[in-house]
């Protein structure tokens, strides 16, 4: 009799995705981040569900309800901080996952890559809306500043912003709809993640060498299940260390002050994982130009497959491209630092140089160096 695992319609899907899946024998720890993102998403949905049981999306009570969760609800504090820091872990894994894709040429799988970009946008939107919910100072002013960017769109901008706000300023209507969207989006992300996997399993995984691994496959279980479990344990170790020892390390002290439309905080800034994009936005003195640069800073990923000029897929055997890649990483870290600094000299010029360098590396230097490397191999 054939194993039920291979015949039952539901079990068969699980089996072909996580058990009998043929996987390359040489994929490194950089391939762990997909499963870690899945764990982060499940963790965020679960902690978020328990938070939603006690949270009220009303301007008068939102801040108090979060305080109530932390003070009065059984283990409410740990649920709240796991959710807040879980978002940080989510983005760390996301950046590593995208970085891996760039380094090893995973973007050659176009459908998988493009759905990944949609997932990135959806996750960023969800995180932004979630940051508004505690209704602290940074929640309110962050929501005001970021939604206001849409007013830069010609002709329809102002109407669009007021439509999103549900009024003439960020208020009760805005908070209620942000809560509704923040609740539904993770489920949309989960559905998209399944489509992401569906397209990945059409082609099979890439591997560090960038060479086809069809002749050397191993079953996903037990080799990569045990490897994923190790990754998950390390993720939980880092997350729980953060939650239990310094839960507010990555947060903003301003968000412990209730939202006040009459008092603007000295430095409005988003969570750390948006600072690189925020720095790019601020580095352009024109409002519409800044918004376009902000959108393009992420959307540029969609152009990467068309800018791939190398004869090799991976950067594993391309030392010049490797140098550029790590320069890009350093540049993104610089942008992240600048995004958290006040708009004054010398931070303005550093941010502008770093922003120009970011687009130059991706659009000009990477394709050029790849062509040079191709020519160096003709000997």
From Swiss-Prot:
Residue numbers binding a ubiquinone:
201
UniProt GO BP: mitochondrial electron transport, ubiquinol to cytochrome c
Alphabetically list the UniProt keywords.
Electron transport, Heme, Iron, Membrane, Metal-binding, Mitochondrion, Mitochondrion inner membrane, Respiratory chain, Transmembrane, Transmembrane helix, Transport, Ubiquinone
Disulfide feature: none
Against Gene3D superfamilies, the record matches this protein to:
Cytochrome Bc1 Complex, Chain C
Q: What's the cofactor?
A: heme b
Xref: Pfam families: Cytochrom_B_C, Cytochrome_B
Residue sites binding heme b b566 per the record: 97, 196
Any one of the GO CC terms: mitochondrial inner membrane
Question: Which GO-annotated molecular functions does the record name?
Answer: metal ion binding; ubiquinol-cytochrome-c reductase activity
Which residues bind heme b b562 per the record? 83, 182
**What residue ranges are annotated as transmembrane?**
33-53, 77-98, 113-133, 178-198, 226-246, 288-308, 320-340, 347-367
What membrane topology is given?
Multi-pass membrane protein
Q: Does the keyword Mitochondrion apply?
A: yes
Q: How is the cofactor bound?
A: Binds 2 heme b groups non-covalently.
Domain of life per record: Eukaryota
More details? Heme 1 (or BL or b562) is low-potential and absorbs at about 562 nm, and heme 2 (or BH or b566) is high-potential and absorbs at about 566 nm.
Q: Please explain the role this protein plays, according to its UniProt record.
A: Component of the ubiquinol-cytochrome c reductase complex (complex III or cytochrome b-c1 complex) that is part of the mitochondrial respiratory chain. The b-c1 complex mediates electron transfer from ubiquinol to cytochrome c. Contributes to the generation of a proton gradient across the mitochondrial membrane that is then used for ATP synthesis.
Q: Which family does it belong to?
A: Belongs to the cytochrome b family.
Question: Subunit arrangement?
Answer: The cytochrome bc1 complex contains 11 subunits: 3 respiratory subunits (MT-CYB, CYC1 and UQCRFS1), 2 core proteins (UQCRC1 and UQCRC2) and 6 low-molecular weight proteins (UQCRH/QCR6, UQCRB/QCR7, UQCRQ/QCR8, UQCR10/QCR9, UQCR11/QCR10 and a cleavage product of UQCRFS1). This cytochrome bc1 complex then forms a dimer.
What name goes with this protein?
A: Cytochrome b
From what organism does this protein derive? Canis aureus (Golden jackal)
Name of the coding gene: MT-CYB
């Amino acid at each position: 009799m054939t194993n039920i695992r291979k015949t039952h319609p539901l079990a068969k899907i699980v089996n072909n995705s996580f058990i009998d899946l043929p996987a390359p024998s040489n994929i490194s720890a950089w391939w762990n981040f997909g499963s870690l993102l899945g764990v982060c998403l499940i963790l965020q949905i679960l902690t978020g569900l328990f938070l939603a049981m006690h949270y009220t999306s009303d301007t008068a009570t939102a801040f108090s309800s979060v305080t109530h969760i932390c003070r009065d609800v059984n283990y409410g504090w740990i649920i709240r901080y796991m959710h807040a820091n879980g978002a940080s872990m989510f983005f760390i894994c996301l950046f590593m996952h995208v970085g891996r894709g760039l380094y090893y040429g995973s973007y050659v799988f176009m459908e998988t890559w493009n759905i990944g970009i949609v997932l990135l946008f959806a996750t960023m939107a969800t995180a932004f809306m979630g940051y508004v919910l505690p209704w602290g100072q940074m929640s309110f002013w962050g929501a005001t500043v970021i939604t206001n960017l849409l007013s830069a769109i010609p002709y329809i901008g102002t109407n669009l912003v007021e439509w999103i706000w549900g009024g003439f300023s960020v208020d009760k209507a805005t908070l209620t709809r942000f809560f509704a969207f923040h609740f539904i989006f993770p489920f949309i992300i989960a559905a998209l993640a399944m489509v992401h996997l569906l397209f990945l399993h059409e082609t099979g995984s890439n591997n560090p060498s960038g060479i086809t691994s069809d002749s050397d496959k191993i079953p996903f279980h037990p080799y990569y299940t045990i490897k994923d479990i190790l990754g998950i344990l390390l993720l939980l170790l880092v997350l729980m260390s953060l939650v239990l020892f310094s839960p507010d390390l990555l947060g903003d002290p301003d968000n412990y002050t209730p939202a006040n439309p009459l008092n603007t905080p000295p430095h409005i800034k988003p969570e750390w994982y948006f600072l690189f994009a925020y720095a790019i936005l601020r580095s352009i003195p024109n409002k519409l130009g800044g918004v376009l640069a902000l959108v393009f800073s992420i959307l540029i990923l969609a152009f990467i497959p068309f800018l791939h000029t190398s004869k090799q897929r991976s950067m594993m055997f391309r030392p010049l491209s490797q140098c550029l890649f790590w320069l890009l990483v350093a540049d993104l870290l610089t942008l992240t630092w600048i995004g958290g600094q006040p708009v004054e000299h010398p931070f303005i010029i550093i941010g502008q140089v770093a922003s120009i360098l970011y687009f130059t590396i991706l659009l000009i230097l990477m394709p050029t160096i790849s062509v040079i490397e191709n020519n160096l191999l003709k000997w």
